Amino acid sequence: MKKTTIALLFAVLFLVLTGCSDKSSDGEKSTADTGKEGTKEIIIGVDDKFAPMGFRDDKNNLVGFDIDMATAAAEHMGATAKFQPIDWKTKETELSSGRIDLIWNGYTITKERQEKVLFTKPYLDNNQVVVTLVDSDVKAIEDLDGKTVGVQALSSAGPALESHPIHEKIKNITEFADNVLALTDLKTGRLDAVVLDEVVIDYYMTTEEGVFTKLDGSLAVEEYGVGVKKGNEKLLEKLQKALDTMNEDGTSAEISTEWFGEDKVLR
């Protein structure tokens, strides 16, 4: 009788432990899927100092045009967007390693990057421009002769500057982790000019009136796209479908108007 009781106790204990194990396994699956009702979580790598595409507001919330676009696209895909601030210099490494699912933050489409990353169709135009202070003696690109110029490290600003004849005459080119640091050094006089995305400086010229000015001419005409890991055509297809739907239903236009005052999204 005692042996029977003990055997039954072991049987019950085994079932309980098995049930706990199953629940633990289910929990791991739900962590991978996350989101409401088991929807997938998409991890998006961003530069959180790249206004107005993705940056921190005065309450430290991550906001911006790309943030809103990515959030809406994830919803259209039945997923939730999780934003992961990354070192922009290592963005392709973060993507290829699987630590992020997408690069989405004013990410310029280039031939070099297309060898490493899958891209969506372009969704926004941009130019690489030269920026100085309003009272600077640098009035034209040719005036950069003998000057010190700042760029964001491993951004498309560097190659754009290198493609221009003035590159050989510039005294120093200083690289920065982000555009905020470069513009800060410009304001303090450690730089004579900064090369950066026109969409970025347009924002700062609005929020800091009377400080910066753009020189005439563009060093490079660019297009932004969303980067997807090579080999993940399935995710690329779903994302592009979501973006196309947003263009058709007016979501993209609404987000663009909120951030730029007009619909600038490419179709």
For the regions a language model picked out, list residue spans one by one.
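C-terminal motif of bacterial Sec signal peptides marking the signal peptidase cleavage site
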Residues: V16-G19
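Ligand-binding clefts/hinges and TM-proximal coupling segments of bilobed small-molecule sensing domains
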Residues: D22-T34, S156-T174, T213-L215, D244-R267
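Acidic, polar ligand-binding/catalytic clefts
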Residues: T71, T80-D143, T213, S218
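Periplasmic-binding protein-like
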Residues: D48, D125-T132, E198, D202-L243, ...
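Ligand-binding cleft/hinge of the Venus flytrap
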Residues: R56, A70-A79, A157-F176, M205-E209
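A ligand-binding cleft/hinge motif common to bilobed small-molecule-binding domains
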Residues: Y107-E115, E162-S163, D185-T188, D192-V221
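Extracytoplasmic small-molecule ligand-binding "clamshell" domains
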Residues: K29-G106
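Extended ligand-binding regions for polar small-molecule ligands
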Residues: S21-K23, I67-H76, E142, A153-S156, ...
